[in-house]
Amino acid sequence: MFSRKKSWTRDAIERRVRELGWWYQHFELPTGVVTGNGQSPAYLPETRWRLIEPYVPASLAGKTVLDTGGNAGYFSVQMMKRGAKRCVLVEPFVEFSEQARFVAEVYGFQIEVINEDVHTFCLTTTERFDYVVFLGLFYHLKYPGIVLDRLAEMTRERMYFHSHVISEEVADHPTRADYMPGQDDRLLADPSFPKMLFLEQLYNGDPTNWWIPTSSALEPLVRSSGMKVVARPHPQLIVAEPDQPLGKVVFDRKLVFPKYGKRGGAVHPGPQRVDPELWRKLLAMRDESEKK
């Protein structure tokens, strides 16, 4: 859906991009202004879009989209360009939410930007969406399985799921219908067995990295959330659709965290801000990158 589009000059866009600080998503805006040159730790979301684009309908007319951890809104914009009726972008950090609102305004799209923790959104919303974008967020979550389960329940047609992984080789692993303590420990310890690695300390200098799955864990995680894998265009990326749950079952229902939480309801951390010292470092990296 289009909003009333403000006329932005190239100079005005360049100035506002600069004012909004460091950008994680580097892409081109109208008039040709780019938000950055793609130097790490930022990235070019267009490379990921090329992988999922073949699995996105050419027309999303009448469809709704949820973009979780949407950052500056690149993927929301791509969905709106295809005619999505409604797009909701959930982003916990104030800085990136402001960038997303600016990007939506520059493009003239009505993107609903919700500045909220994704755990909170998933545990409290009763909405469902036709398409769910869950890219580059899973490993930043303290409770990723809860969020994946809820997003699977919220998906009507298709989910795009990406996670950083340890070892991109998708290897076969020994399986059992039921693993026995002791005698099957060697199978569970096999490097190819699906695993989630917990990070107590920093990973890549980022305090928001908590869990990293192995490549072999992505598909079992998706299946156990009640979805089927329809494509895997990259070791880190899965396209999934709703299915009957294939994982563990409790009381004839999928094992999933209740959406309204326990013991008085979910905790709402509210909007968050990037650590000031980290933000200064990122800005310094941006400035140094621009000199090259």
PLM region spans:
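Conserved alpha-helix/loop element of class I SAM-dependent methyltransferases that forms part
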Residues: A42-A61
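Class I SAM-dependent methyltransferase SAM/SAH-binding core
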Residues: Q78, R82-Q110
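Conserved SAM-binding strand-loop segment of SAM-dependent methyltransferases
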Residues: G108-V118
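N-terminal, positively charged/glycine-rich alpha-helical extensions of SAM-dependent methyltransferases
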Residues: M1-V34
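S-adenosyl-L-methionine-dependent methyltransferase catalytic module, highlighting the catalytic core
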Residues: F129, V133-F134, K142-G270, R280
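Short conserved loop adjoining the S-adenosyl-L-methionine
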Residues: T120-T126
